[in-house]
From Swiss-Prot:
GO function term, MF aspect, one: glucan exo-1,3-beta-glucosidase activity
Protein's UniProt name: Glucan 1,3-beta-glucosidase
Entry's family note: Belongs to the glycosyl hydrolase 5 (cellulase A) family.
Record-listed E.C. numbers: 3.2.1.58
Keywords, comma-separated and alphabetical: Carbohydrate metabolism, Cell wall biogenesis/degradation, Glycosidase, Hydrolase, Polysaccharide degradation, Secreted
Species this chain originates from: Pseudotsuga menziesii (Douglas-fir)
Coiled coil: none
EC supergroup of this enzyme: hydrolase
Compartments, record wording: Secreted
Residues spanning the signal sequence: none
Single GO cellular component term: extracellular region
InterPro entries referenced in this protein's UniProt entry, alphabetically: Glycoside_hydrolase_SF (IPR017853)
GO biological process terms held by the UniProt record: cell wall organization; polysaccharide catabolic process
Catalytic activity: Successive hydrolysis of beta-D-glucose units from the non-reducing ends of (1->3)-beta-D-glucans, releasing alpha-glucose
Length: 40
């Protein structure tokens, strides 16, 4: 068997911030802007 199978290794791919994912922000939290365009 290959080393990956022999050692029971796996891969988890996280696409929560990928283009076209659930939301348009880089991370899960929504960024809010004040009246001057500054992130709050």
């Amino acid at each position: 068997a290959t080393p990956i199978l022999r050692n029971h290794l796996g891969v988890i791919i996280d696409l929560h911030a990928a283009p076209g994912s659930q939301n348009p922000w880089e991370h899960y939290a929504k960024v809010q802007m004040d009246v001057y365009g500054q992130a709050t």
